[in-house]
Amino acid sequence: MKSLFKKILILIFICLLPTSKIFAEDKIRIGLVVPLTGEYSTIGDSIIKSTRLALNKINDEKFEIVPGDTKANPIDALKASKALYDQGIKIIIGPVFNESTKYLDELNDVTFISLTNKIYGNPPNVISAGVNAISQFQTIDKFRNLNEIQRTIILIPKSDYRKEIELAI
């Protein structure tokens, strides 16, 4: 998980390089909305620590991560994101859970890099950074072709992942 955060942060920083803000004295502030309280607070704590490690590796004082607590629910994810937006933050890493992205289209000036692996039904301003069903099936297909496997059986569970898997196939 730590390497995923490093890659995401480096990608964000590279995307920001061409902007004039990089050459300004101002800090580049990036939001981080994760569950900091409640049942999933250990996940949020781990993400905060991973992000700090990535920032230490980058070793540039211009970047600042500003956390917000989603409490692992969509209403608090929107509240935390709105609070970050009100501080002028327009790039936010998170939320972790797909359900928490439900109302984020209300902040259409903000780009979210969500840690969820679901891509079906996300708001247009949410980019999923997790490993999704499409990339998994592309890997399976590549393996099949390399090993000349002719037939494959796929069992799809009756769950909220069903539509995602059907789209990937």
Each PLM stretch: what is its role?
Residues T42-I58, D76, Q136-T139, D160-I169:
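Short, solvent-exposed amphipathic alpha-helices that sit
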Residues P74-K90, K142-F143:
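Short, well-structured alpha-helical segments in soluble
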Residues G31-K49, I58, G68-T70:
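Extracytoplasmic "Venus flytrap"
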Residues F23-I30, E61, N145-E148:
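Immediate post-signal peptide segment of exported/extracytoplasmic ligand-binding proteins
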Residues L4-A24:
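Classical Sec-dependent N-terminal signal peptides that target proteins to the secretory pathway
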Residues I91-L155, D160-A168:
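Extracytoplasmic ligand/sensor domains, especially the bilobed periplasmic-binding protein
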Residues I65-D76, A80, G130-V131, I156:
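Short beta->alpha junction loops
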